[in-house]
Amino acid sequence: MPRDSKSSFNFQDLMLHRIHEILLVASPYDSFILEEDGRLTQQILYEYLGMNLSYAPRVWHAKNATTGLKMLSDRSYDLVIVMMRIADMDPITFGEKVKAEYPDKPIVLLAFDESEITSLPQERMQKSIDKVFIWSGNANLFPAVIKNFEDKMNFKRDYKIADIRAIILVEDNPRYYSVILPLIYRTALLHARDLISKSLSDTDRLLLFRARPKIILVSTYEEAIKYYDDYRHNILGFISDVRFPKNNELDDHAGIKLAEYIRQKDSDMPIILQSTNPHHNEDATAINASFIHKKSSSLLQELEDFIINNFGFGDFIFRNKRGKEISSASDLKSLKKSLNKIPDKTLEYHASKNHFSNWLAVRGEFSIASIIRPLKVIDFNTLDDLRKLIIEQIDMSLKANNEGRIVQYSSTTKDKSLNFVRLSTGSLGGKARGLAFAINLLSESKIDKKYNNIKLRV
């Protein structure tokens, strides 16, 4: 079972499996295009170092398949990216040779156009290539590919350790997921970067990066159903195509069937369906799902708006029944303040859509999110009872977050409940070290739980 709170695990336990070394097998011309047009190395460094992550992967180039196989035998690589146009071997044969020696090595086939991969033997490709991506000049694709493989490797373990959340993208068309995946990661990481400035401590900053929602890309009905059945309460929502494989055959209504399956157990799970057929809008409405036309000129903007409004990214925006904003919250304190004054109808609307649990989970507040997630409005005699429960959980989390912590002073930390505040940078002095240690001992001992009506503070 997942642990109860973010304080019960070490942030270093998360994201154990990393991609550090990447082998790019590409012709000199393709390598040049990627570096000049896509700024491959520059973009990877920018994305990782810009997020204060010190493990930016290194990219090693091999000009042909023979050189690539030799380099694989000389050192270890975490990910292999092979381009379509390599001189001495087709990419499928290269993938087969790599898989024969290193069966668990992830291999990505990168093409410049979708038409390039239609002539490839599909059955052989499925066994030798883990994923196909289409390069369209978007430099954000490379960090998204890297992070997506890391997420898939780490999700099961991080779920058990820390109750991590996930967003499921169901799409079998490489052209579309090569565009959508970078958008989701950009939204998630920009959100994490924004939260960093509002965090109380260095530990919180690192936790927020490692505890961000995982983005899981699947391409079949069966894969999507398995993730839903196994991790139902930890899924923030689904972004799904309508037409993709089911029972090893393309099904024109697979996305509709997936949404119907989810709705049988979960009436509030955020789902957005995408299709080139605008008539599926009616099908989506019938099962309480949102819809985006894939050929819409505002596809990416509509998708980003859905992600921010339904998956907990950005400030919490309270709205009335007409959709008008009536209040907003950027952290737990302002969320509590707003909860005390919003109308019952607004509370009911957001509670019924899982907005509270998703917003809290994205911020690493897994304990509250896990408590609130399964609750339904009908479980309470009055909406005030629901309001009180959420506020009580927020109070408990605020107290737990502050216990035994040395908090950096800022305009957002002026709170009488804080035990210990650091006014400037540098090491603590002797007296301060002793006081900080005493606070830490009291916090770890949980002595206040042993004796009722007693408050111990330094």
Task: Briefly describe each language-model feature range.
Residues 91, 121-132, 283-291:
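As written
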Residues 252, 256, 278, 297, ...:
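Conserved structured core elements
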